Amino acid sequence: NNYYRYNFGAGAFDDITPNGGERHHFVSQSALSENGYSTKTAYSIRMMTADHRNTGSYGNQNYVKQESALLKNRQYEDLLQKEVNDFKAKRDCDGIERNLQLKYHMEIITCLVEYEKLFGIA
């Protein structure tokens, strides 16, 4: 039998622990801080380390600059869609789901709801 045990979650960055994985700011830490948002309370996803390192914002300054520009211009829906599209375009490191959007579906939904509240678009 192939058993898989995951403990994914979403919450404010300082409120969730990595639990053997990593915490991924749904909107990158740099883009948030450059635009005056708290990175400690910004919603993040607890995810597998390999998945985190495969996200668009991980170590990719061009991606982060695009995020920051969208935030600066208050293009919040476009920013959130960019994050969802990135998850959809990335493969699951475990090969169980087709992509990260499916693997972290509930966590993405949680982040979207919280970021819509934060940005005043809920």
Language-model regions: role of each:
Residues 1-122:
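Catalytic toxin/effector domains delivered as secreted proteins or via bacterial secretion systems
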